[in-house]
């Protein structure tokens, strides 16, 4: 069954509910999305080599998802959607203090599919056990922030387009400063 997501303007203003497939087909429709970067007490960031219809087998932030319009008529908050993604993708059940560090827009088309998103850049700290669901990713790794930034700069093709855009937000506010 197709999930229902929230179409929005470039500034994130809600427009209407749409099937996820509409948001990602052809030119797509701009819609609300989330990417989350988890870091640990050592200052490392958690990356995932994602299984993805459009951007398969490249590095992503820790997790990415969309706030959903639920069957009960409510919309997930950014925090609820982020917690859902971390639970589904890594079996993280404990609460993580999440912060939204800002939004960015991006569009990328590959064949008949696309990404057309107004994306929240969420972050949170976690030092617990990870059990990645093999249906969502090939592997994960903890990496030093500085090494991560150097690799994104030197090998941008190894990263999802939203990672490259999200890094700009993180650098602008000083989150990825050494």
Protein language model annotation of sequence segments:
Residues 91-92, 175:
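Helix N-cap/coil-helix junction residues
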Residues 21-25, 103-109:
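Short, solvent-exposed loop/turn elements at beta->coil junctions and helix N-caps
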Residues 23-34, 44-84, 88:
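Conserved Nudix-box catalytic region and its N-terminal flanking loop in Nudix hydrolases
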Residues 59, 63, 105, 113-178:
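Nudix hydrolase/Nudix homology domain
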Residues 93-103:
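A short coil-to-beta-strand element that immediately follows conserved catalytic motifs
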Residues 1-42, 50:
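Acidic, metal-coordinating catalytic segment for phosphate/diphosphate chemistry
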Residues 36, 100, 120-124:
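A structural signal for short, well-ordered beta-strand segments
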């Amino acid at each position: 069954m197709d999930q229902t997501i929230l179409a929005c303007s470039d500034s994130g203003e809600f427009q209407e509910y749409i099937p996820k497939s509409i948001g990602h087909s052809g030119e797509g429709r701009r819609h609300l999305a989330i990417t989350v970067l988890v870091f640990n007490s050592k200052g490392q960031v958690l990356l995932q080599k994602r299984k993805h219809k459009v951007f398969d087998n490249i590095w992503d932030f820790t997790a990415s998802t969309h706030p959903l319009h639920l069957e009960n008529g409510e919309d997930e908050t950014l925090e609820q959607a982020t917690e859902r993604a971390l639970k589904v993708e890594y079996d993280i059940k404990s609460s993580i203090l999440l912060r939204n560090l800002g939004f960015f827009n991006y569009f990328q088309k590959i064949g008949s599919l696309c990404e057309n998103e107004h994306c929240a850049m969420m972050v949170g700290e976690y030092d617990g056990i990870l059990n990645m669901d093999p249906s969502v990713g090939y592997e994960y790794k903890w990496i030093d922030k500085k090494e991560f930034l150097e690799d994104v700069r030197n090998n941008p093709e190894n990263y999802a387009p939203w990672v490259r855009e999200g890094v700009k937000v993180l650098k602008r506010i000083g989150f990825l400063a050494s």
